[in-house]
Amino acid sequence: PLTILPSGLYFRSETGGLLLLGKSMEEDRVGFDFAWERKRFMEILWPELAEFVPAFDTLKLMRGWAGLYAVNRLDGNAILGEWPETKGLFLANGFSGHGLQQAPAVGRYLAELITRNMPTLDLRLFSPERILANRPLTENGLV
């Protein structure tokens, strides 16, 4: 199971007895510098994790990584469908980490939209029109 703390710090068990954890922070630089900062991790994330589960303070840090994380800044949810201002431009983006989990349903939905078939899934709440209208979806538990 995935545990998400109110601050957005998340963690889950990984194969081999490992623990995977992370957190996206507003002050993170945008760009292509994928250098992982061990010191920053130890100063910011580790104390929060150990405060939540004191036994975690005895864990050994093995490695870390950094990378791009696509985020829909309006509400953190997918943007699916035809862009109203450009006919024929279909979007499937802004998943904020949900993409792999939702890919099968999204692929089916977009294929049906593009071929002008009636969608068998009702995913209209993710329509690009909500972006233009500034109508965010609310969901707790996004990381």
Language-model features and meaning:
Residues 1-88:
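Active-site substrate-recognition segment that forms the wall
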Residues 50-143:
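C-terminal catalytic lobe of FAD-dependent flavoproteins
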